[in-house]
Amino acid sequence: MKRRFLVEFRLQGAACNGFTYDVSPSGIFVRSARLPTPGTFLTAKLHLPEGKRIEVRGRVIRSFRVSAALSRLIPSGFSIRLSDSPEEYYQLFMAS
């Protein structure tokens, strides 16, 4: 499901952010200039409508950067396979 939420995460101690490009009950694709290495375990905070924030955790399974020429067609970013998500996350899919 295509949904755009602000995503905050940390890489090597640095605060980073991106936006969801695609979300599903089992994972998230995040568009971001900062790309974690596949295999990295990541905690991310999603900013939902009405000021709600939820924290999800998972392992990065894919990470890639496209050339500037393709960036309007194909997003650079990474995929997280979720392993720990609150009930509020799953409610996003029941509402749609």
Question: What annotation goes with each model-predicted range?
Answer:
Residues 1-96:
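Structured alpha-helical
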